[in-house]
């Protein structure tokens, strides 16, 4: 995302490069110079390829910076120069490899006196190494011209960066022929002999360590190369030189002078251990011996190496008895005087490697020297040195696992001579391995019983005992080992058997850790017995969720008692259900007929016809007009639909209205009634109730709703359009009151004649009926279209009453019913107007949300 949107800041290097007098240091002061160089900025690369710039870069990494500079920025430019030269830009590599002047300036760094600056040496080694890998022919040709190159490498071998450069020269050259030429050239320069001469007590420790590591890496690299190139016609010259008997004798003679130097001895033993390596173990703890019949040099040890070591075995044995002088070591366990030391530890490692070769002559020499006895003494003496214990355990395991040796084989023999395993006999009979193990175990138990600390070698001792038991039972020398145990004195034999069956068995049992539990994995359905029954009754519907309803339709007997009582509740209503059902079906049929226009031949549902509005429709029309002067088309359509539904209802079907709602109902007739098809005034102010014929434009545009501006009141809820009778509570109501305080029910029945001729005769009159549960009072409502005023006139008549205690709603079906009342004249009485306004306001407030 960072690069996608180009949010990185632009580099200042391009701006600097546009200047003619820009210098290299100014560019190196920029923070992003390395990124620009690795991105191969064309201008920057061209600038760096200048001769003076490359010379400055090489100078920075080969010359010491001034001493008076701040330490924080002293090596800033050498570091940047090294990074720029090793950024792996092909143009820079080509220029450095082809320009001999730059190579000479770079090579001049080796001419400095030792010790070299370690940091500058690392810069020099890094630059020359990348040139060797990228331009091998040019660099090798240049180095061969220098007669003192190998001498300078040996001179500065104490610097680790120079040692790395030598190894790079051996490993970074990919062409096989060129690599072979380099090996031959270095062998001719006697680099192996010079490195061996460095492993001398007269040299310092750094030179010992680096020379030894260089020789070890040369051995490993040469053997790896032999594995990769099986058909190589020429052997590795450096490895062959190092395995020469004269070179090995020279190496051993250097370390066994009168003056014993621990660093030189350890370095020489490291080289011998590398020569004794056959093939690296496939995994830790695995001894990879040479397979039978395989004579590859990687799987065998050179005889010259074994012969040279065998001659110096007494000297190595003496090192175990008299190591180089070391100081007293204080540890948390106590004072070690003398400590084991690195020399004796490496000598035991060398003996373990010799035992792995299973050479008869070497085994005879070790028996004569009693080297294993000395090693066992050290094992029990230094009870807290785990490095020593590990090597002793390896030595004993190798002796027990190796087959019987044969005098005519100097390397690993595949013969198993049970009666000729001299080293195994020596271990049991001369070294008294069994007796020493039993004695040490008893001492440890006694010490622990007294509250003392357990010996540190007890873990390794347990493994040694298990190895002996395994060798007696299933080992390659089981016959000989079993016979050697039987040849023990009777007392020792009994103690051994008791120890194996009691102490050893208990220790192994205690040390054994079960990685996997014995309990088998089973289905979770078997665990149902582990779950207790809940203390509460569970819903049977949840228990039967997801099952087949036909199969599991029966409810459980443990259902909740409170839910069982639901069936006892009586939901019957005291209502005229037959009339309600008939009214509901009639309404549904009417709605289906109105909107079923798919090929029907019935009359158009939009055709004007005699309609009458229910109380709810009139209320919504009145209340909507009082709140605002605007109306939406959707509300107009809803009003028309309500009219269609009301026109189909029989005048004997009555709706029961709550008296509480009727008590708060009032009507307001001062606002013009803008309901469609009823008393709608034309937008130009003409009298729609007059007998004059309307204009043609109004006839064609009678259904245009764009000019209606009164929206419905937003405070109203969704109204119910169902014509079914509703049973409500019946409270005592004053039958003569027409305002809100009297709690009356008002039903407004309006009849609008849609025909043009009938409008002129009957348009000025509306009838509103005020009634309650016991009687009705009919008010004749007269509307003057010119003055837009409405006046009520009371007219008593005998009205039918409902048999129920609730109020009934009378619907005037057609215009004839409305014409039974004589028309009333408009009145200008202020008192009647106030009554009308109060009725309208109360009606709107009472019937707001339905």
From Swiss-Prot:
One of its GO terms (biological process) is regulation of signal transduction. Residues 627-638 have a biased composition (Acidic residues). GO terms for cellular component: cytosol; nucleus. The lineage of its organism: Eukaryota, Metazoa, Chordata, Craniata, Vertebrata. Regulatory subunit of protein phosphatase 6 (PP6). May function as a scaffolding PP6 subunit. This is Serine/threonine-protein phosphatase 6 regulatory subunit 3-B. Residues 826-839 have a biased composition (Low complexity). PANTHER family: SERINE_THREONINE-PROTEIN PHOSPHATASE 6 REGULATORY SUBUNIT 3, SIT4 YEAST -ASSOCIATING PROTEIN-RELATED. It comes from the Eukaryota. Residues 610-652, 683-778, 793-850 are annotated as: Disordered. Residues 703-731, 764-778 have a biased composition (Polar residues). Belongs to the SAPS family. InterPro entries: ARM-type_fold, SAPS. GO terms for molecular function: protein phosphatase binding; protein phosphatase regulator activity.
